[in-house]
Structure formats: structure tokens, C-alpha cells
Amino acid sequence: MISADNAHGVHPNYTEKADPVNRPYLNKGIVIKHSANQKYCTDGYSAAVFKDICRQAGVPFQTFTNRSDMPGGSTLGNISMAQVSVNAVDIGLPQLAMHSPYETAGVEDTDYFIKAAAVFFE
């Protein structure tokens, strides 16, 4: 199962807010979201399966990890996994200024998601 939402991209005005290693950028691919606190449903297996889907679709992917020293968001993916035991991955398209009046996302990432979704549903 895919839990599809958006993902925090590295904001050029607030680069220090992003994880120093996992830094999603706009128009650089679909983001696979991980959380050591299980705020996302992604595990090693589901991430590997989704990476293979991206490779088959010919689209790039990136990773996002919540910083360990700062609270972060979550999705409904981890909540639903408590009710239904299926393999699932939390993904999103990177955007700037999530939950603000002016969110910004990359149009190429939308095309990447459409291609990956087509492979997933085949």
C-alpha cells in the first residue's frame, strides 16, 4: 500500500531546519519518508519495493527523515498500519512552506509521481 502525502523540502531560507543528510529538493524526485519514531509506515522492505517501482518507472527518488532533535509531523499511514497489517510506504512530493498560505511544489515531481503510480497499479 502507498500512503501518499507531501513531504518537507529543504527551504532555502531555513536550511538549518532540514536533516543534514536527507535533504529533499523540489523537482528532484518522489520522497520516501522515514521516521525512527514510527511516525511513518515506511520500513526497509517497503522502501526497497518502492525504490524498485521508481526504477521501473524511470523516475528519481529521495529520502526524508525527521530530525532526531526536533519534533516532526506524521501521516495517516502509521495510524492505519495499527489497524491493518499490510506492507506500506509513506511517500510524498517535496514542497516548501507546508501548511502555510503559500505552499510551493515542483511540477516535475508531479510527473514523476504519475509515472510511478502507473507502474504501481500495473
Sequence positions of predicted segments:
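Active-site-adjacent substrate-binding region
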Residues: 11-14, 18-105
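A glycine-rich helix N-cap at a beta->alpha junction
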Residues: 1-2
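Structured mid-domain segments that build the active-site/substrate or prosthetic-cofactor binding neighborhood
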Residues: 118
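Short, glycine/acidic-enriched loop or turn micro-motifs at the edges of active sites
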Residues: 8
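Short secondary-structure subsegments characteristic of cysteine-rich extracellular domains
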Residues: 106-115
